């Protein structure tokens, strides 16, 4: 009994000593923290606010970038072409996502040799909303059109993300390569707004399979757009890891050496037209064209006079040459329409 009491007394004294030592250590540790906060409290508070805002932006970037449900019912109803032969296609990506595509074939003269345009749309709506534009391309350019709904858009499964959209574009190109009725030597990529970033990425990774790219009213990158849209906040100082979606087109364009057409609407109120000019200047292509439309807005540049003429001339120029890289002696060409 006495031994038990002595053991308990020893444990009790040891616990009291440990608690006393821990409290002393805490006081020593708290002192520099209190002094630091007293001297630099304002800076620490600003840093905490900055980190909080960055965290919120990271979490909600998808909400700010992707609008698959605008206009309403875009996820429920996808308009289809009427009176025109077309194929409503579903394919699978490498990660198992089911995508919806619409293929509209040109059926006129020399149709087996017609170029095929893979059409990547912007960040809202679905492929059905692009049919008026696509049908005019069909008539004026005499091409096949393959319209793509990204994951999370229209009848495609999944949720949109940067890496997801890249996987989608790769799956679409792989599918085109399996079609015996499409000329593999005349594959053009077209991308508007967000679709331009997708097209640039796909071209940068598949230069041997792509004949040319055409991008319209697209951006340098998401960080560049954030600095433009949120100019009241020092977004330019945020490191890249703060961005969930980056779409670094200004870097990837350096890998796009195929013929390139940059279409810029100078009345674009969403993406600064200067970004299109900068992408054009960054392009290493020996055959690059910049078509400028002073009255062109972000979504409606295709309605400007001379729009389809510019695309037609570019496509004919690419198709006419057996070696696209030797197509022109001049390094660039700017057209103001």
Swiss-Prot record:
It is found in: Membrane. It is an enzyme of class 3 (hydrolase). It holds the Pfam family Abhydrolase_1. Gene3D superfamilies: alpha/beta hydrolase. One of its GO terms (cellular component) is dendrite cytoplasm. InterPro entries: AB_hydrolase_1, AB_hydrolase_fold. It comes from the Eukaryota. Its EC number is 3.-.-.-. GO terms for molecular function: palmitoyl-(protein) hydrolase activity. Its main location: membrane. It is a single-pass type II membrane protein. Signal peptide: none annotated. Keywords: Glycoprotein, Hydrolase, Membrane, Signal-anchor, Transmembrane, Transmembrane helix. Glycans are attached at residue 299. The active site is at 193 (charge relay system), 268 (charge relay system), 298 (charge relay system). The chain crosses the membrane at residues 37-57. The keyword Transmembrane applies. SUPFAM superfamilies: alpha/beta-Hydrolases. Belongs to the serine esterase family. This is Protein ABHD13. It comes from Homo sapiens (Human).
């Amino acid at each position: 009994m006495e031994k038990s009491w002595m053991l308990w007394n020893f444990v009790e004294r040891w616990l009291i000593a440990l608690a006393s030592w821990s409290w002393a250590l805490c006081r020593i540790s708290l002192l520099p923290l209190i002094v630091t906060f007293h001297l630099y409290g304002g800076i620490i508070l600003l840093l905490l606010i900055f980190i909080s805002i960055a965290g919120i932006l990271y979490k909600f970037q998808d909400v700010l970038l992707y609008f698959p449900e605008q206009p309403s019912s875009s996820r429920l109803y996808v308009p289809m072409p009427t009176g025109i032969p077309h194929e409503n296609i579903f394919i699978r990506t490498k990660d198992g996502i089911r995508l919806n595509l619409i293929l509209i074939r040109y059926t006129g003269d020399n149709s087996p040799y017609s170029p095929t345009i893979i059409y990547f749309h912007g960040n809202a709506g679905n492929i059905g909303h692009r049919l008026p534009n696509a049908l005019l391309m069909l008539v004026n350019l005499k091409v096949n059109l393959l319209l793509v709904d990204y994951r999370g858009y229209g009848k495609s499964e999944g949720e949109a993300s940067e890496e997801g959209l890249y996987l989608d574009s790769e799956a679409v190109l792989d599918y085109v390569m399996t079609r015996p009725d499409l000329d593999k030597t005349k594959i053009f990529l077209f991308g508007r707004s967000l679709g331009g970033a997708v097209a640039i990425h796909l071209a940068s990774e598949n230069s041997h399979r792509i004949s040319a790219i055409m991008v319209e009213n697209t951006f340098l990158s998401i960080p560049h757009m954030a600095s433009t849209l949120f100019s009241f906040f020092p977004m330019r100082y945020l490191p890249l890891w703060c961005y969930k979606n980056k779409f670094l087109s200004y870097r990837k364009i350096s890998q796009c050496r195929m013929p390139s057409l940059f279409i810029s609407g100078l009345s674009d109120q969403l993406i600064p037209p200067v970004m299109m000019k900068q992408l054009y200047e960054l392009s290493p292509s020996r055959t690059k064209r910049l078509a400028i439309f002073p009255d062109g807005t972000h979504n409606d540049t295709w309605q400007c006079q001379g729009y389809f003429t510019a695309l037609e001339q570019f496509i004919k120029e690419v198709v006419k040459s057996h070696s696209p890289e030797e197509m022109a002696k001049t390094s660039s060409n700017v057209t103001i329409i």
